[in-house]
Amino acid sequence: MRHIFWAGDSTVACNKFNTYPQTGIAQAFDRYTKEDVVIYNHAVNGRSTKSFIDESRLAVIYDEITKGDYLFIQFGHNDEKINDPTRYTKPHEDFIVNLGKFVNVARNKGAYPVFITSVERRLFDEKGNLKPSEHTEYVKGMKEAGEKFNVPVVDLFTMSRNFLEKTGDEASKKYYMNLVAGEADWAPEGKIDNSHLKYEGALLYAGMIAKGLSELDEPYRSLIIDNLALAKYLDIETNG
């Protein structure tokens, strides 16, 4: 069996019935992996690289991950929280340093690290145009870290932003946690949430990550089902 350890925030984390239909990307990812792949979802709501490390969550992964495993590293949303010193990191300074700590954990145990940029928030202006992103500098920081540490980067940010721009305001609403009254017992009056995902959104963006991995060299691409099967779930062009 091959094991994926996934470190991240609420866009990745496991959700249960009390927050349904919210779904983390990692919860939907096994639709795209081969049968011998097992996912261990260590993502936790509200965590940044800093708080994840400070709470010893990376240390837990270090104790469990072994040679030949994979470490998916997906942060950015909460590293932006400039008014919260327990979470905030500077995108081109300690954010990169922290990402290096994740890489060290993987490589010290003989595992393969992967950086995944943040999924874009669904924020449109009154004219129906997607607003400038709050994630940009952290995406750049993660790409810098990828070059510095020689780690592959799956650019979910760009893929998700392109999808939102193409799909538009109204049609993209169903992928995010925008609830009408009565749709969820825990939010009887409804909810507007353009950061977190319903199952449809988690499945979509998990597929984008799978597509990105399938385009990498080994040992990454062999995690993913073949291109024809992948295309069944994604509206993408494929050569075979």
Q: PLM features: residue spans?
A:
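Short, histidine-centered active-site or binding-site loop motifs used for metal coordination
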Residues: 8-10, 46, 79, 119-120
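Short, exposed beta-strand "edge-strand" segments with a Pro/Gly-rich flavor and a Y/T-containing core
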Residues: 19-23, 44-47, 148-154, 191
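Structural motif
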Residues: 48-56
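Alpha-helical cap/lid subdomain in secreted, periplasmic
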Residues: 57-203, 207-225, 230-240
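Glycine/Thr-rich phosphate-binding loops of Rossmann-like dinucleotide-binding domains
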Residues: 14, 49-50, 81, 124
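Serine-esterase "nucleophile elbow" of acetyl-processing enzymes
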Residues: 1-44, 59-67
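Short, basic, glycine/proline-bearing loop/turn elements
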Residues: 9, 42-47, 87-88, 127
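Residues that cap or flank secondary-structure elements
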Residues: 17, 21, 53, 94, ...
